[in-house]
């Protein structure tokens, strides 16, 4: 049996659209939150870094688009 990891590395932008927070392939670095790291099923999954336009940052583990496990917020 061969298990294939379908996660990829990339960039996503997080923002609220129509009252719902979501992750998008395109965004504006000046207004949207930016995620760089592992992506699976269109969401942050694995190791990655999230940066807010105001400089706030989280670096660590992600699961299904949410901070999960170990990480550091600055």
Regions picked out by a protein language model, each given a short descriptive name:
Residues 1-74:
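Intrinsically disordered, low-complexity repeat tracts enriched in Gly/Pro/Ser/Thr and acidic residues
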């Amino acid at each position: 049996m061969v298990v294939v990891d379908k996660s990829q590395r990339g960039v996503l932008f997080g923002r609220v659209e129509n009252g719902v927070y979501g992750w998008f392939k395109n965004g504006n670095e000046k207004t949207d939150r930016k995620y760089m790291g592992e992506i699976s099923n269109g969401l942050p999954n694995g190791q990655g870094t999230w940066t807010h336009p105001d400089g706030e940052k989280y670096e660590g583990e992600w699961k299904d688009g949410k901070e999960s496990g170990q990480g550091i917020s600055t």
